[in-house]
A protein has these predicted regions:
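Active-site machinery of serine-nucleophile hydrolases
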Residues: 86-88, 92-138
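C-terminal catalytic histidine-bearing segment of alpha/beta-hydrolase fold enzymes
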Residues: 206-208, 212-224, 228-271
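Alpha-helical scaffolding within the catalytic cores
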Residues: 102-113, 136-137, 141, 187-198, ...
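A domain-start/cap signature at the N-terminus of enzymes
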Residues: 7-13, 19-87, 225, 231-234, ...
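Short, proline-enriched alpha-helix->beta-strand connector loops that line the catalytic pocket
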Residues: 118, 199-205
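Gly/Ser-rich "nucleophile elbow"/oxyanion-hole loop immediately N-terminal to the catalytic nucleophile
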Residues: 75-76, 80-84, 131-163
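Primarily recognizes the serine-hydrolase "nucleophile elbow" in alpha/beta-hydrolase
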Residues: 155-200
């Protein structure tokens, strides 16, 4: 009897040890590594053309990228204060749609519905041609925008994309998992590999598709469920008849009932 009891204790101990090891592994793979020292690159830092308004700062960089940057008014004259920890949205437009990016997406993320959650900076990044392609270049640009605006929190960057921009936002997250805390994808069609999925487990995704978005849905419909199932606090929002859409502020995910702004509130305020 004592032998049986001893064996039971040993088995229980091994089980608890295994559970503890599994918990430590799970914690490790779901803990996001963030950008360390940022990389200064003069072609991405310096601008050959500038134009500032009360709301937006425009820059044309020597690297060939144009962008608009919004810094909340209360921080605009204190942009070198690193202690402010201002979150940043990086917005990626659809293919050949850079002409409408500022008015459509820039306006959405400077809306009080977003800014009342937390005062956030907004970077509207225009593709060098009609679409985005080079992940290294984009990472360098974002890093150099942060170097110039030290009030931005490099640990709290959220990507937003529509169509090809949504595809690219997920692609960029897979390329450099330390860059984004979360990714918002509307009508994106990136087909994630299992190896990439392991890299982005700590990143939070809101991934939206519509079944009647022919050609897009078929490509992206495997990625969304994988992200929701395995990635931290992630949502797959699948619609029946929404067409080729971008994620909007009042969105609610069918099925789960998750509310976009509530999800975003949690993302932005989480340490």
């Amino acid at each position: 009897m004592n032998g049986i009891k001893k064996n039971v204790i040993i088995v229980a101990g091994i089980f608890l040890l295994a559970m503890g090891i599994c918990a430590l592994i799970a914690k490790a793979i779901y803990t996001r590594k963030t950008l360390g020292e940022l990389t200064f690159e003069p072609d991405y830092y310096w601008a050959e053309e500038k134009a500032d308004t009360d709301k937006w700062d425009f820059r044309k960089t020597y690297a060939g990228y144009d962008y608009f940057l919004y810094i909340p008014p209360e921080y605009k004259n204190d942009r070198h204060n690193e202690s402010l920890k201002v979150p940043l949205f990086v917005l990626f437009h659809g293919s050949e749609n850079k002409g409408i990016s500022l008015g459509r997406y820039g306006r959405m993320f400077t809306d009080k519905k977003i800014q009342s959650i937390r005062s956030c900076a907004v970077l509207v990044l225009l593709a060098r041609c009609g679409y985005y392609s080079d992940c290294h270049d984009t990472s360098m640009l974002i890093q150099n925008v942060i170097i110039q605006n030290e009030c931005i929190d490099k640990k709290n960057i959220v990507a937003f994309g529509h169509s090809q921009g949504a595809y690219y936002a997920v692609k960029l997250a897979c390329y450099e998992p330390r860059l984004f805390k979360a990714v918002i994808s509307g009508s994106g069609y990136y087909q994630i590999t299992h190896r990439e999925l392991l890299k982005v487990l700590p990143i939070q995704f809101w991934f939206g598709l519509s079944k009647n978005d022919k050609g897009i849905y078929e490509q992206g419909c495997t990625t969304g469920p994988l992200l929701e199932k395995f990635c931290k606090n992630s949502v797959y929002a699948e619609y029946e008849n929404r067409g080729h859409f971008w994620v909007e502020l009042d969105d609610v995910a069918p099925g789960s009932g998750r509310v976009f702004l509530e999800w975003l509130d949690k993302v932005l305020k989480e340490a």
